Amino acid sequence: MPRLDVRGVSVRFGGNVALDDASLSADAGCVTGLIGPNGAGKTTLFNVVTGLLPPTSGAVAIDGSDITGLNPHKRARRGLARTFQRLELFTMLTVRENILVAADIHRKWSRDKEDPAERTDAIIGRIGLRATADVRVTALPTGQGRLVELGRALACKPTVLLLDEPASGQDDGETEQFARLLRELAEEGVAVVLVEHDVRLVMAVCDVISVLDFGRVIAMGTPAEIQSDEAVLTAYLGASKGSE
């Protein structure tokens, strides 16, 4: 049974189809990639999974339990966390405070006995931001801001982690660090779903990849299978390689 199971999800805005019978599954202990051209529906799918957008049809389940009708905070209690394509940090707070807010909220609604301050400190070390822990996030470069947002998601101890273009703005060193962290999270049993335009990162870190085009899943397979799929080459990878 997949940790996350999205089945036949469609989203329509009037006559516009954002998702068309899209399905996606993510297993515990795996990094699942979700790629496709701009406007393919990747963020829309994340919004459906997290409860920010109701589907026109279809269903979402975690560990076999249907969560389609649950609001976002109840989905979070089921172990779901995400980052956003645009940074959504508390701009008046420091790195430490941003993560501590999430850790404290998690303890309150989960009855977790771990001290939020201790968890926050451990996460700061894990994402490599000890030197800037007490700096306001507005002073950080974008790549480090992405790490703060990841740290805030980790404060909620997710079993399903959705990452929307988390490597955007990162330099090569930060991307390498990020890739190692994703693999560590998978090895700890987290189901990671990665939306990312950095094709090299996706191919290096993902166990399986799904490809969206015009709201439909056109391919699913291992990185090697995706790289040789004619439909994917036509719709996405060929264009991506040509733009590098």
Q: In which residue ranges do the predicted regions lie?
A:
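Glycine-rich phosphate-binding loops of nucleotide-dependent enzymes
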Residues: P2-E244
